[in-house]
UniProtKB/Swiss-Prot annotation:
Motif RCR-1 positions after renumbering to this chain: 14-17
Positions bound to ATP: G220, D221, S222, R223, T224, G225, K226, T227
Region (Oligomerization): 155-175
Amino-acid positions noted as binding a divalent metal cation in the UniProt annotation, renumbered to this chain: E48, H56, H58, D106
GO cellular component: host cell nucleus
Name by which UniProt lists this protein: Replication-associated protein
Motif segment (RCR-2): 56-58
Magnesium recorded as keyword: no
Cofactor: Mg(2+); Mn(2+)
Amino acid sequence: MRTPRFRIQAKNVFLTYPKCSIPKEHLLSFIQTLSLQSNPKFIKICRELHQNGEPHLHALIQFEGKITITNNRLFDCVHPSCSTSFHPNIQGAKSSSDVKSYLDKDGDTVEWGQFQIDGRSARGGQQSANDAYAKALNSGSKSEALNVIRELVPKDFVLQFHNLNSNLDRIFQEPPAPYVSPFPCSSFDQVPVEIEEWVADNVRDSAARPWRPNSIVIEGDSRTGKTIWARSLGPHNYLCGHLDLSPKVFNNAAWYNVIDDVDPHYLKHFKEFMGSQRDWQSNTKYGKPVQIKGGIPTIFLCNPGPTSSYKEFLAEEKQEALKAWALKNAIFITLTEPLYSGSNQSHSQTSQEASHPA
């Protein structure tokens, strides 16, 4: 009886080298140097120790196109430190995703190229999707989670990318980096008594602050130290020019908000901020509404002028009712002098308020 002729046609090839002590890096280099019908797109090598301690090597090779293998010695590899040659079992890989998952299970791997999603899996159905999403949640970061979903659930990656992107932003949300003031609060030695009293009563942690703190509006010329002073008081949200309440910028654990150089005519959520309101939502332009915990005071910083001053805005005839409300929820201070006296702050004050002229 004739021995069947060896022949494999496949776009993805799975190799197993039993009892093989070749370094996985050497095998990777060896495969890369082979002259093959189609160029490899991705190669992954895994070193696996069986229960008896013997090492095995597995390799997944993805090609640009389908190749035909008739030489069963094509992938025989010689150990770099001796003359021993190791012969692999050669198979076509029906699901490269499943093979890659198998190679990844022990973690002792090396790879080259970009893995090609094949969309096929021997483990079909809902459980496979659940496993994929569980792996994504355990990946540790948004980018890694998206890579897992792209690889294991490519249909969801394409059709649900917008929702996945938004949901993973929330799941792997990192709080904004804390601001470090260039000057301590104590260096501002010309702060009016009314402002100091407001700070003592309202800028406190959640356990000590009032249930509905008062806000404060501070109006004054540029380079009086308003911005740096306001940002030196403690953990805060800084909103300048426009409001970005996304989790990447806005921190619900902050002690207070600073709204700097925002025209009051176009200030979104005017009452929510000035009234220290709790548990409100803000619609975002391209995403889902964000939930704001609230209950913290806001420091409004502005310059004189019709497009900056809150006093001038509230003095408009059509804002009469809003003015009456605002006077019950905030105090209004006009600065005539800088908040500091020392010349040692002049350079940083100038550079800070040149960017934020409020």
